[in-house]
Amino acid sequence: MEASWGSFNAERGWYVSVQQPEEAEAEELSPLLSNELHRQRSPGVSFGLSVFNLMNAIMGSGILGLAYVLANTGVFGFSFLLLTVALLASYSVHLLLSMCIQTAVTSYEDLGLFAFGLPGKLVVAGTIIIQNIGAMSSYLLIIKTELPAAIAEFLTGDYSRYWYLDGQTLLIIICVGIVFPLALLPKIGFLGYTSSLSFFFMMFFALVVIIKKWSIPCPLTLNYVEKGFQISNVTDDCKPKLFHFSKESAYALPTMAFSFLCHTSILPIYCELQSPSKKRMQNVTNTAIALSFLIYFISALFGYLTFYDKVESELLKGYSKYLSHDVVVMTVKLCILFAVLLTVPLIHFPARKAVTMMFFSNFPFSWIRHFLITLALNIIIVLLAIYVPDIRNVFGVVGASTSTCLIFIFPGLFYLKLSREDFLSWKKLGAFVLLIFGILVGNFSLALIIFDWINK
C-alpha cells in the first residue's frame, strides 16, 4: 500500500499532534526535504526569486478586475474584504506548510490522500486542474481581447484586415512561441527571472494608474455614443462611495479569492527554495502576499477614482476609450499584457503535476508524457479563451467553485481531519473558521452569480 502512494515516510492515519513550545519552534525551522535528498538537488532558488515566482502565481489578470469590484463594494468595503482575504490566504498557507512538515509529504494532492485516502487525492487533483485551466484561460482571454487594440493604437490607417490585429491569430502564435516552450521547463525555479520581470511590469502599471488619475477629468468630458445613448459623467458621479452593494457585488469575494490564490504553487516553490524551512517559506509567502496586496489596492483605488461608476470590468478598456493615443498608456498596456502572459507558464506547473499524480503517479518521469500533457493543457486553454466571451464569467464561476476550495476549504478541512489537538485550540478554531468562511463564500457567491445570469 505504501508503494502505491508514492514516497510517504509515514502510514496513513498519522496525525498532527499537540506540540510543546520547543517542538513547535523546531517545526518552524525544520526542512521539508531530508538533508540527504536536499544535497542531491541543486543549491536551490534564492529567497528573492521565490518571492517573485509566488507573486507571479498570485498576480495576473485579476488586477484588471479589482477596480470594478471596488466600484461595487465601496472604498471601505473593498479595503476590509481585500485585507480579510489576504490574511486568510496567508493563514491557510501556514496550515498547509504545518501539515506538510508533520506528514512528510510534498504536494497538495498527497495531503488529500493522507486525509481522505484516494478519493481525497482525486478531488484535490481535479480541483487544481479545473482551477488552473480556468485561470490560464482567463489570462489568455485578456491577451486575445486587449493585444490587438494595443497594437492598433501604435498604427495609423486601416490595418483591420492584417493578421497581427486578429486576436485569435495572435493568441495561437503567442501560445506556440512563448507559453508552450516556457511551460515545458522541468523546474518552476527556472521561471524566477521572468517572474521578476512580470513583477516590475505590474509596479509600472500601478504607477501609471496613479499618474493618469489626473489626466482624465471628472465629470468625464468625452461624449461617447453607444447603441444610440450618450454616456457622460455628472458631478454626483465624482464622489467616491465608501460602502456600496448591488448584484454585481457577488463577484467581489470570488474575484478577490481568485486574485490571491497561489496555494497550488506553494509546495513546488518550497521544494526548490534555497535552505528550505517552514519559517523561511512562510516569510516568502507573507512577503509575496503583502506586496501583491499593496499593488492590488493602489491600482484598484486609483483606477476607481479615475472612472468612478464608469469603471470597466477590465480596467484597460477605460483607458482605451478616453486616452486612446497616449504613449504611456499604450506602453503600459503592452507591459501588463506581457506580465499576464508570463503568468501562464507558471500556472502550467501545478496543473501538469495534478494530471500526472492523478493518472501516472506510479510511473517514472518521461519527457514524452511531460510534453504531451503540456501540449494538451495548452490546447484546452486556447479553446476556452476563444469561446468564453466575458472575463467576469471566468472570475466569478472559477472563484466561487474551485478557488475557494483550494484557498479556504481544503486547508481547513484537512487540518481538522489530521489534527488531534483540542478543538478549542487556536489553530483548530482557525481552521474551522477558514472552512466555514470558504463554504459560505463559495455557495453564496455562486448562487448570486447564477441568479444574475438568469435575470440577464
UniProtKB/Swiss-Prot annotation:
It is found in: Cell membrane; Synapse. Coiled coil: none annotated. It catalyses: L-glutamine(out) = L-glutamine(in); L-glutamate(out) = L-glutamate(in). One of its GO terms (biological process) is amino acid transmembrane transport. Its main location: membrane. The keyword S-adenosyl-L-methionine does not apply. The modification Phosphoserine is found at S4, S7. It comes from the Eukaryota. Disulfide bonds join C218-C238. Glycans are attached at N233, N283. GO terms for molecular function: L-glutamate transmembrane transporter activity; L-glutamine transmembrane transporter activity. The chain crosses the membrane at residues 42-62, 85-105, 111-131, 170-190, 191-211, 250-270, 288-308, 327-347, 371-391, 394-414, 431-451. It is a multi-pass membrane protein. Pfam families: Aa_trans (PF01490). The modification N-acetylmethionine is found at M1. GO terms for cellular component: plasma membrane; synapse. Keywords: Acetylation, Amino-acid transport, Cell membrane, Disulfide bond, Glycoprotein, Membrane, Phosphoprotein, Synapse, Transmembrane, Transmembrane helix, Transport. Belongs to the amino acid/polyamine transporter 2 family. Amino acid transporter with an apparent selectivity for L-glutamine and L-glutamate. May facilitate glutamine uptake in excitatory neurons. The transport mechanism remains to be elucidated. This is Solute carrier family 38 member 6. The lineage of its organism: Eukaryota, Metazoa, Chordata, Craniata, Vertebrata.
